[in-house]
């Protein structure tokens, strides 16, 4: 029985952009901080972030037209409210106002990924990579996740590793790499990296689901149950929770059957 639990469709949610609500602020410099703080893939000094200081606004951010910033902010807001289709209207407007707006192209890719539009997502991520000169981690993660969705794991691996060079602290990125390695059947590497991802981000439920898949492939039902329990503690009502509970029951039956076989063998004279 194939018990693998698929997380592919959740990549779009995994790559969504967290926001800081700034509805009452109208100063253009403040508005531009949305660009710096919005995506999850920035590489600012963690010590500066931990002290709560805002990164300085670069000359590039200051060069972005106000209309582009406002459209981008609206697009990110719609994306955060689970309206990827609605976000695209604003994000496309932002990119038309500022053609090198690589953050907007990246967000478009995330929206298209969540809508299940693979080719459109790929084009948007590639535009973001090109516009940033390859120095922005977000679209590399997005493209790698898309390729994992398409089971193009060999192609995905170097792209994800490039993203991790740019943003090594992004926990979900390590999970995406582990997913690619799992797809390549490099189970030891996948297990190590998925475990590291779960430590980097203790709330990253999908890392436990991937570890469960690794143990399913190894027929290690005891460890599978440990990871499924961890996943369900974090996501008791998640989109894959029903599958996880079915896998739990299957693993328990397999373990019970193993115990019966062992006891029968021990009872033989």
Predicted regions and their residues:
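Canonical tetratricopeptide repeat
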Residues: 107, 141-142, 176, 210, ...
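Terminal, low-structured helical/coil segments at or just beyond the last alpha-helical repeat
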Residues: 27-38, 44-47, 52-55, 59, ...
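Helix-start (N-cap) detector for alpha-helical repeat units in TPR-like alpha-solenoids
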Residues: 68, 102-103, 135-138, 171-172, ...
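Bacterial N-terminal signal peptides
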Residues: 8-16
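TPR-adjacent "capping" and linker segments in tetratricopeptide-repeat scaffold/adaptor proteins
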Residues: 53-70, 132-135
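Structural signature of tandem alpha-helical TPR/SEL1-like repeats
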Residues: 80-93, 114-127, 149-162, 183-196, ...
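Structural marker of alpha-solenoid helical repeat scaffolds
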Residues: 97, 131-132, 166, 200, ...
């Amino acid at each position: 029985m194939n018990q693998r639990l698929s997380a592919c469709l959740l990549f779009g949610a995994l790559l969504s952009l967290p926001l800081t609500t700034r509805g009452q602020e109208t100063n253009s410099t403040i508005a531009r901080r949305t660009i710096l703080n919005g995506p999850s893939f920035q590489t600012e000094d963690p010590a500066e972030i931990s002290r709560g200081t805002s990164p300085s606004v670069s000359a590039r951010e200051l060069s972005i037209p106000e209309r582009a910033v406002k459209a981008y902010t609206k697009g990110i807001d719609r994306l955060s409210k689970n309206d990827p289709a609605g976000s695209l209207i604003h994000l496309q407007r932002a990119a038309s106002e500022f053609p090198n707006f690589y953050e907007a192209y990246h967000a478009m890719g995330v929206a298209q990924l969540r809508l299940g539009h693979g080719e459109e997502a790929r084009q948007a991520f590639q535009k973001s990579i090109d516009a940033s000169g390859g120095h922005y981690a977000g679209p590399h993660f997005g493209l790698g996740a898309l390729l994992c969705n398409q089971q193009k794991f060999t192609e995905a691996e170097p792209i994800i590793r490039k993203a991790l060079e740019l943003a090594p602290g992004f926990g979900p990125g390590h999970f995406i790499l582990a997913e690619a390695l799992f797809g390549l059947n490099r189970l030891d590497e996948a297990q190590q990296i998925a475990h590291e991802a779960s430590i980097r981000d203790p709330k990253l439920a999908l890392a436990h689901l991937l570890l469960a898949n690794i143990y399913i492939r190894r027929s290690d039902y005891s460890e599978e149950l440990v990871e499924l329990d961890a996943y369900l503690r974090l996501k008791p009502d998640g989109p894959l929770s029903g599958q996880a509970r079915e896998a739990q029951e299957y693993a328990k039956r397999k373990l019970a059957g193993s115990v019966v076989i062992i006891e029968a063998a021990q009872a033989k004279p």
